[in-house]
A protein has these predicted regions:
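N-terminal beta-strand/alpha-helix entry module and adjacent surface
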Residues: 1-117, 123-162
Length: 162
């Protein structure tokens, strides 16, 4: 499938690249930028709002590009974290079994991409729940450019955290 490129190029320090039309920039311009492919954004929202009463999660796949002046995170793919039936009452978790399945799917469907963060979708995010998600992020996705994308299906709010 041919990928249509924008005619305008973004120049960042010494990093010059053409952005495909199917990417959208998230957040305010600054030294760190997040770009997400429309496919990935649409897939996350379809998962989140298909059963908005359920807690769901997955990993974000892509790449990080750096220059002297800025860092850009490109999200190109998503893999859902499928929690086994007997563990669904625990809510969102990332244990060894779940990671094994995620890495098997990455190898099969996205072998050229790396884990660049994760998403969580749930109805309502209390302060206590947010602290749990933040700890989950630090335990499983620590690193300079790893992002957390939270979808509050009750309030229909979506936020990226770097």
């Amino acid at each position: 499938m041919a990928e249509e490129k924008r005619s305008d190029q973004k120049k960042t320090g010494e990093l010059t690249r053409s952005l495909p039309r199917n990417y959208r920039q998230i957040g305010e311009p600054g030294a760190k930028k997040i770009y997400i492919e429309d496919y990935a954004f649409t897939y996350i929202n379809s998962v989140a709002y298909q059963t908005p009463e359920d807690e769901q999660a997955g990993v974000l796949l892509g790449e990080v590009q750096k220059s002297d002046e800025e860092k850009c995170l490109f999200i190109k793919g998503v893999i859902r974290a499928k929690t086994p039936e007997n563990e669904t009452k625990q809510g969102i978790i990332f244990n060894e079994k779940i990671w094994e399945k995620i890495y098997a799917e990455i190898e099969k469907f996205f072998p050229d991409l790396e884990v660049v963060g994760w998403f969580a979708a749930m109805p309502g995010i209390t302060q206590e729940r947010f602290l749990y998600l933040k700890k989950l992020h630090m335990d499983n996705f620590s690193g300079g450019m790893k992002t957390m994308y939270l979808v509050n299906t009750c309030d229909k709010e979506e936020n990226f955290y770097l």
